[in-house]
Amino acid sequence: MRWIFRSGGLGAVGLMLVAVGARFATAANLPVGSLGVTPAAQGEYGTIKGRLVWGGSDVPPARALIEKGRAQKDPEICAREAAIPNRELVVDPKTKGVVSGFAYLVKPKGSNPGAVKELLTRSPKAELDQKNCEFLPYVLAIHQDQTLVIKSSDPVNHNVRYAAFANSPFNQIMAPKGEIEVKLVAERRPIVVACDIHSWMKAYIMVFDHPFFAVTGADGAFEIKGVPAGEQNLVLWQERVGYVGFTDPAKKAQGRAVTIRAGEVTDLGSVAIDPAQVK
């Protein structure tokens, strides 16, 4: 049997049991839905792309969070074969691209219902794994119509804990090779997911009620397709910096204005992180 939790608002976490069903596609940080807006006319969509890059001359070196063989808890599993990397700020030394940043629209004007059907058909569930005593992926963007599957590939106990704004607090023991399903509603900010048994473990989940979001790749690149034409507000967020590339510091959570033209690609080029802003 598999536990399914439904979380939202101020109510208590609901719960029910269902039989284990079919397996699911790997989660993708691609458009999957849109709510509460008037659909754009067919073909009136464009694409936003760009790269989140390190703005300093010296690239921060890769660092270990837990050195090989040095885990304080469950060392027979955690960091036994290799060090657990520090993923808070990872910069590609060749391209200066910054991985694992969120790129998304704030209060998008318009919708793309075709993208909803396409991605929910292909990937109705998104997955967060506890593997080798770390959460993978470290950063995950999902739509609230997807089911979040949190599982453990490890043969040791973990737990899953988060406290959010729109979703009820959650804290659940994860047995070895265990699995739970969670339904989340949209949040304005990333949710921090932690394991208290292994205090170094964490991940970030951003939940949207629209389809216009992405996560930056290994070279810092991001692309959001199917965006309704017109002026939109784009936000870039990275764990160690917070909001990036905003035009008005007083409204940094609103991002920057971007004009989308139907059938065209709006290329923002490189959006640089100022090293002085790293926390």
Name each model-derived stretch.
Residues 25-279:
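Extracytoplasmic copper-binding redox domains, predominantly the cupredoxin/blue-copper superfamily
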